């Protein structure tokens, strides 16, 4: 009821940096837009995927991405983290995963990039990972719709989460409908 919602609102810390991570087409942007409607997050900044905008600027995406392009994506994530209270639909984990799978980036550059980028993982208070299991790929005209590539990015993200879990205070897997995911997020951040 209303009293329950009111109690929940009181227990959410004022300033939190919350990131959603996961491969393409798992509902990250949809979820951020839904969280934006909640009174609990009325004082938050929200950042959603800008790949279409960046692609329009001439920055190559997905397997065609370059070191320069991935550096722009990393800078965007860092800019988001300059906000005290932010909810974003991409994290540093995502940026590293896409960098690892870019064809034109040399292996040693990928390693240097990862080593540098991972330092910013400490900034997140919460990261929520969304699995692609059982979810179809939607074509938004920009994202990669190749199932194999989506699985590779997911594998890279989950591997990075295991590798660097000690650097993030709270990493939680969420699943289900948008409503169920919201409930899971609220349960974690209010505890």
Task: List where the protein language model places each region.
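Short hydrophobic targeting helices and cationic amphipathic motifs
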Residues: 5-7
